[in-house]
Amino acid sequence: MSRIANKPIVIPNGVEVKVENNVFKVKGPKGELSQEFLPYIKIEVNENEIYVKPNLEFMKRKSDLKKMKMFTGTYWRLFNNMIIGVTQGFRKELEIIGIGYRAQLQGKKLVMNLGYAHPVEMEIPSDVAVEVPSPNRIVVSGIDKQRVGQVAADIRRWREPNVYSGKGIRYVGEVVRLKEGKKA
């Protein structure tokens, strides 16, 4: 079994957890999340702890147990991220590097000048908040870790860092290894 799934997930105060029909639901101070899970997994909810275990009722062969154990660690991490999301939330920061490269919010759209002939406009999803504290910095935040990461990756994809000059959109703290240019 996944070693991480041996530990229980601690439910903090102010968080409600429900398991109904293979759907794990979490409600907390920042919002509500739900995640469907496979029937191979059995979830035991005690007073303030959650245990993720393989469901042995579905085991027909010995090889099935390996598949069930494989999913326990994945779902343990997904459920733990949901609990962290509804209590603390997640955020990703991006920085824009390059002369004339900048971003701004216009209503529900993120408008970026990234060296193309036209400004790039991107709709902001309703479940994610995007802030632009300065023209060369973008902050993506929300309660769903997967969603926050995907929106940040979509923004970064518009102009990934150039390996020769380093210009583009990168995560704060990301190290871009620069290649050496041609020698004359």
From Swiss-Prot:
Domain of life: Bacteria
Gene Ontology biological-process entries: cytoplasmic translation
UniProt keyword annotation of rRNA-binding present: yes
Any Pfam family: Ribosomal_L6
A GO MF term: structural constituent of ribosome
GO CC annotations, alphabetized: cytosolic large ribosomal subunit
Keyword line: Ribonucleoprotein, Ribosomal protein, RNA-binding, rRNA-binding
Zinc-finger listed as a keyword: no
Alphabetical list of InterPro entries matching this protein: Ribosomal_uL6-like, Ribosomal_uL6-like_a/b-dom_sf, Ribosomal_uL6_a/b-dom, Ribosomal_uL6_bac-type
HAMAP family, per the entry: Ribosomal_uL6_B
Family as reported in the entry's similarity comment: Belongs to the universal ribosomal protein uL6 family.
Subunit details: Part of the 50S ribosomal subunit.
Function of the molecule: This protein binds to the 23S rRNA, and is important in its secondary structure. It is located near the subunit interface in the base of the L7/L12 stalk, and near the tRNA binding site of the peptidyltransferase center.
UniProt-recorded name of the protein: Large ribosomal subunit protein uL6
Species name: Thermosipho melanesiensis (strain DSM 12029 / CIP 104789 / BI429)
Species classification: Bacteria, Thermotogati, Thermotogota, Thermotogae, Thermotogales
